[in-house]
């Protein structure tokens, strides 16, 4: 089995696609009007308009209703990203903090309220854990 993507459902596709394009520096592919994909080296971030939910079953997902998932990106320098993103991010949850498991992280909400974590492994153990990934 191969992990292929994570999909965010939104009522405002263009706004959310623009946010993630600015966050990642990657231009989204648009295989269909209500759908976009940002293809990163490790996984694809898919963004679908809420009208696509009916294709999976009415009510199977609700835009902006995520309370249990954090979308995470490993970056080279989380402190530099924090500085870069200050004008893009409206709601910061956590400023740069070194976590007990060895990652230095920032946590914020995207325009739909989804939690996003950017992190850099900073301890020797964390650096070793991510080698080869």
What are these model-derived regions, one by one?
Residues 9, 72-74:
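Short hydrophobic/aromatic beta-strand micro-patches
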Residues 10-12, 100:
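Conserved beta-strand-loop-alpha-helix junction that forms the acyl-donor binding cleft
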Residues 1-4, 26-72, 82-109, 120-133:
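Vicinal oxygen chelate
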Residues 12-13, 76-78:
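Helix N-cap motif at beta-to-alpha junctions
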Residues 16-21, 85, 113:
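Conserved active-site tyrosine of GNAT-family acetyltransferases
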Residues 77, 110-112:
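Acidic active-site catalytic centers that drive phospho-/nucleotidyl reactions
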């Amino acid at each position: 089995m191969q992990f292929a993507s994570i999909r965010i459902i939104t009522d405002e596709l263009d706004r959310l696609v623009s946010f993630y394009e600015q966050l990642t520096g990657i231009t989204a592919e648009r295989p269909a009007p209500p759908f976009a994909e940002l293809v990163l080296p490790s996984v694809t971030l898919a963004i679908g308009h809420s009208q696509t939910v009916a294709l999976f079953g009415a009510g199977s997902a609700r835009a902006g209703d995520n309370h249990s998932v954090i979308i995470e990106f490993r970056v080279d320098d989380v402190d530099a990203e924090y500085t870069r993103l200050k004008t893009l991010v409206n709601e910061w949850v956590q400023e740069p903090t070194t976590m007990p498991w060895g990652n230095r992280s920032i946590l914020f909400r995207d325009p739909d309220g989804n939690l996003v974590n950017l992190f850099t492994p900073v301890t020797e153990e964390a650096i070793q854990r991510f080698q080869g990934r």
